[in-house]
Amino acid sequence: MTSSTPRNEELFDRARQLMPGGVNSPVRAFGSVGGTPRFMVSAKGPYLMDADGNEYVDLVCSWGPALLGHAHPAVLDAVHAAVDRGLSFGASTPDEANLAEIVMERVPAVERLRMVSTGTEATMTAVRLARGFTGRNLIIKFAGCYHGHLDGLLAAAGSGVATLALPGSAGVTEATAAETLVLPYNDLAAVKEAFATHGSNIAAVITEAAPANMGVVTPGEGFNLGLSRITREHGALLIVDEVLTGFRTGYSGYWGLTGGAPDATDPWTPDLLTFGKVIGGGMPTAALGGRADVMDYLAPTGPVYQAGTLSGNPVAMAAGVATLTHATRDVYSYIDVRSLELSSALSSALDAAGVDHSIQFAGNLFSVAFGTSAHGVHNYADAQGQEAFRYAPFFHSMLESGVYLPPSVFEAWFLSAAHDDAAMNRIFDALPAAAKAAAAAQG
């Protein structure tokens, strides 16, 4: 049991005097589930430890980067060696090219790569690049898809925006918002209509490879392929955001499981992709890449400006190289099996408690949506229409049993290569009580 949290409470009280809401990223405040956020002080393998000494099996995994488990020895060794050489040089380093080569080998759609520091910076640069390359202004995004907190893409965004039930963000000007067309996800007819009306001024369509920020939503059959065909027909670019799914859902990301798979019956290729999370191995780094002719529009070879003091930071590059080097196909196969085991156990527990639900998948990522078994979740409207009130009691029951879940129903669950039988059994043991708590919840 983890009900004793006096130190966490003290830390949160102090943090609220120093930082907006006491956090540096809104979802950490437990706003949609209530209670005291946990302040973590250490992590090892599949486990987290909070400031009160409570241990949790971790199903957040740093929102994806801890693919190998926390504090993996090879990653720590690489980071320690890099730190010994210096933290930042303001110049290029060998591991930038080493990491780029690994990404390009795994994702053949990437012909050039630019390192940045955050996923938001990657998508921001991709959008600017698309506008510069095409000479057009409008961007199509999909309701519920989250692409970081750049102004033009916050309308009807998922992730923390969905968690806080916000339509977008204050501070985004009408002029900026007017350059973004927000369409329903999984609706190719709406995309075709938008191009019929605005096609000559649409620079790009940006989409998550598989959305995981309104809960996990599987792209409908032919949806991503259709986006590729429509954009090419109209001279626009397709930007596929794999900040979350890249090298997390599979060896080559979600694109590698679908349109880029060797046995794909209907292959499709994005013009640009964005990456983050896993490629930094827990350190802050991200990247954008894609067609050489498009990427070469970036400075210094082209007129689209992008720069960053810490882009390609040597410590982050070392962590990324070590993580992807050890993220073998066997690692993904192992996580795939664990994901199926956990999702099956979750569904069985909810069924036994009489809780209507559906479980949504994107590779080894999944999430649960309550009250949706009849139709599943195909877009943002479906996600918002679920019985979200059942998640908070479910979450807190799991937390009390020592399992740390995402503190929002709109986020994916993550497993790692370090989740062994002992860790999985602790999760399985906690599920029946949590399912009963969800069943008893009143909306």
From Swiss-Prot:
Record's protein name: Glutamate-1-semialdehyde 2,1-aminomutase
Keyword set includes Isomerase: yes
Annotated compartments: Cytoplasm
Pathway noted in the entry: Porphyrin-containing compound metabolism; protoporphyrin-IX biosynthesis; 5-aminolevulinate from L-glutamyl-tRNA(Glu): step 2/2
Gene: hemL
Domain of life: Bacteria
Enzyme Commission number(s) of this protein: 5.4.3.8
Cofactor(s), names only, from the UniProt record: pyridoxal 5'-phosphate
Organism annotation: Pseudarthrobacter chlorophenolicus (strain ATCC 700700 / DSM 12829 / CIP 107037 / JCM 12360 / KCTC 9906 / NCIMB 13794 / A6)
Gene Ontology CC terms, in alphabetical order: cytoplasm
